Swiss-Prot record:
The protein's name: L-carnitine/gamma-butyrobetaine antiporter
Localisation per UniProt entry: Cell inner membrane
Keywords: Antiport, Cell inner membrane, Cell membrane, Membrane, Transmembrane, Transmembrane helix, Transport
Domain of life where this protein originates: Bacteria
MF-aspect GO terms: (R)-carnitine:4-(trimethylammonio)butanoate antiporter activity
CC per GO annotation: plasma membrane
Segments crossing the lipid bilayer: 10-30, 50-70, 92-112, 143-163, 195-215, 231-251, 263-283, 316-336, 347-367, 403-423, 446-466, 475-495
Catalytic activity entry: 4-(trimethylamino)butanoate(in) + (R)-carnitine(out) = 4-(trimethylamino)butanoate(out) + (R)-carnitine(in)
Taxonomy of the source species: Bacteria, Pseudomonadati, Pseudomonadota, Gammaproteobacteria, Enterobacterales
Organism: Citrobacter koseri (strain ATCC BAA-895 / CDC 4225-83 / SGSC4696)
Length: 505
């Protein structure tokens, strides 16, 4: 019994370093928020201006990798011996469900305002040209390109799971073909895993930092409770306690039901916005934006604004590419898990078609609604952001719809459930990654899951205390830097191993 308990406990070499590093960074930040903001601005400026080009080339190279997988020698290789675990419809629906987080609702509702007010290509702010390129850039940042770049990692993890039968819970496990077992399981592998975990902790804390103000602003609208940092902290604490109760009482089935409710409610809310906001305008704007995307795609791919130095590609494209990089391993593991039995080509096409449809629907419907409210002078978004913050501006885009109280209740429930499932997924992923001998289908220790959910909650509160979007963007970019190299190593490891076990015919 004692030995069994030891085997299922924490793995010190990947548990304590991330805990200590993140704890120290949080303590230093809280101790002097002004100094922390100065450092944050410096880090953001350095990474985006000096190394932004690397993120752009990474995405382009990975895009070519997608074409190689779809039309190359491994296109018809099957990921596992069994038939597909899920029907195609269920498979696509699960992909859509993975895109309906509160952070996505945050960006989908407000992103277009930033593109119109500070547009790329030296366009005049608020001009027709800025509005025409606004949604096109959202479709670029959340469209086929980033989903195609996930294909290599998704195929790689599916290959290691179902073809090589490896028990992969940390990225170092996949690096054996590339660096050898000694290094993959030694100091090098430990460093890789710690980079991954620190970046993942900050990414999850960032998502929580985006989601929480939406819920508290909904509470202010519905119940008249003033939105303060203290209320944000109380709400995050309630989520952590609720997550602990669910885990302790074996209510994971309830969390699964909540996740399904989130998906169906997302469909309902998006359908409602589409109908009442202006279906004809939305479809026309979307069609026009696809044309703009195709026309400007080459420049968007390589746009660094080296001469004009307007800062648009650094503030948005590089930031979003870092966002995609930092979530790549976690998302690819999920996509691989649900793709057992499918061919490489099926997985690559399914990701690009299914996931692009999901994100394009979200950004088109929500972004078009925001633009309409601005054009009709129903909302003064710059004033709302200046006086009350970004979250209030987002809430007002929903409150401006017909039957505002019912609409706000729907949005409140959607954001609340999305964040509960986010914290549950965060604590589970981090606990699985920092414990030893926790097999697929088993549960990691309760206290470890609760501990990680607390730490993620603390990061969310710290980011909220710093204020504004820049700390959140910097946390993503800083975390994306080490994972940039980790993702490349996992990809190269797959290619090297597949040459041996998937010999060309």
């Amino acid at each position: 019994m004692k030995n069994e308990k030891r085997k299922s406990g924490i793995e010190p070499k990947v548990f304590f370093p991330p805990l200590i590093i993140v704890g120290i960074l949080c303590w230093l930040t809280v101790r002097d928020l002004d100094a922390a903001n100065i450092v944050i601005n410096a880090v953001f400026s350095y990474v985006t201006n000096i190394w932004g080009w690397a993120f752009e080339w990474y995405m382009v190279v990975m895009l070519f990798g997608w074409f190689w997988l779809v039309f190359g020698p491994y296109a018809k290789k099957r990921l596992g011996d069994e038939p597909p675990e899920f029907s195609t419809a269920s498979w696509i629906f699960m992909m859509f469900a993975s895109c309906t987080s509160a952070a996505v609702l945050f960006w989908g509702s407000i992103e277009i305002y930033y593109y119109i007010s500070t547009p790329p290509f030296a366009l005049a702010p608020g001009s027709n040209g800025a509005k025409e390129i606004g949604l096109a850039y959202s479709l670029f940042h959340w469209g086929p390109l980033p989903w195609a770049t996930y294909s290599f990692l998704s195929v790689a993890f599916a290959y290691f799971f179902f073809v090589r039968k490896m028990d992969v819970i940390r990225p170092s496990s996949t690096l054996v073909p590339l660096v050898g077992e000694k290094h993959a399981k030694g100091l090098f592998g430990t460093i890789v895993d710690n980079f991954y975990l620190v970046a993942l902790i900050f990414a999850m804390g960032t998502s929580l930092g985006l989601a929480t103000p939406l819920v508290t602003e909904c509470m202010q609208y519905l119940f008249g409770i003033p939105h303060t940092l203290e209320l944000d902290a109380i709400i995050i604490t309630c989520w952590i306690v609720l997550n602990a109760i669910c885990v302790a009482c074996g209510l994971q089935k309830g969390v699964k039901i909540a996740s399904d409710v989130r998906s169906y409610l997302s469909f309902l809310m998006l359908g409602w916005v589409f109908i009442v906001s202006g279906a004809s305008f939305i479809m026309n704007y979307f069609t026009d934006s696809v044309g703009m995307l195709l026309m400007y795609l080459p420049r968007m791919l390589f746009y660094t604004d080296a001469i004009g130095k307007g800062g648009f590609p650094q503030g948005w494209t590089v930031f979003y590419w870092a966002w995609w990089v930092i979530y790549a391993i976690q998302m690819s593991i999920f996509l691989a898990r649900i793709s057992r039995g499918r061919t490489v080509r099926e997985l690559c096409f399914g990701m690009v078609l299914g996931l692009t449809a999901s994100t394009w629907i979200l950004w088109t419907v929500l972004g078009s609604n925001t633009l309409l409210l601005m054009d009709k002078n129903i909302l003064n978004i710059p004033q709302l952001i200046e006086q009350h913050g970004v979250a209030r501006a987002i809430i007002e885009t929903w409150a401006a719809l017909p039957f505002s109280t019912a609409t706000m209740w729907g949005f409140f429930i959607l954001c609340f459930i999305a964040t509960v499932t986010l914290i549950n997924a965060c604590s589970y992923t981090l606990a699985m990654s920092t414990c030893r001998e926790v097999r697929d289908g088993e549960e990691p220790p309760l206290l470890v899951r609760i501990g990680w959910s607390v730490l993620v909650g603390v990061i969310g509160i710290v980011l909220l205390a710093l204020g504004g979007l820049k700390p959140i963007q910097t946390a993503i970019i800083a975390g994306g830097c080490p994972l940039f190299f980790v993702n490349i190593m996992v990809t190269l490891s797959f290619i090297k191993d597949a040459k041996v076990h998937w010999k060309d015919k």
